[in-house]
Amino acid sequence: MMQSIGSYHHNNMSNHHHRDILNRKRFEIVECLNFQRTLLLNYLRSNHVFDEEDCELIMAEKANRARAGKFIDFLLMKGSEAYQHFLDVIQVENANLYESLTGDKATSRKFSVYF
């Protein structure tokens, strides 16, 4: 199925925008993510953003900050839809980080994240 030029341009701009945010806020994200809890990776797996191998490679890192850095590297390759799923779960798990990344106030819509 072919994308229209406008649709391609919008998707390309969205990809560039989320990549820019992830790169600019990388230090803050690395400091805030906690891979001791499994909600983030489980949610992204259930939404087919990450697969089992992605999660294993992230969790193979010894330190939490190394895991967070690897996570961002993987997320950068996944596209704007993956970034939106990331924001959905971060809104529940870390409201301050969500607000820093989006400029929007986090809501308590937990039901949208849980299966």
Q: Which functions belong to the PLM regions below?
A:
Residues M1-F115:
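Death-fold homotypic interaction modules
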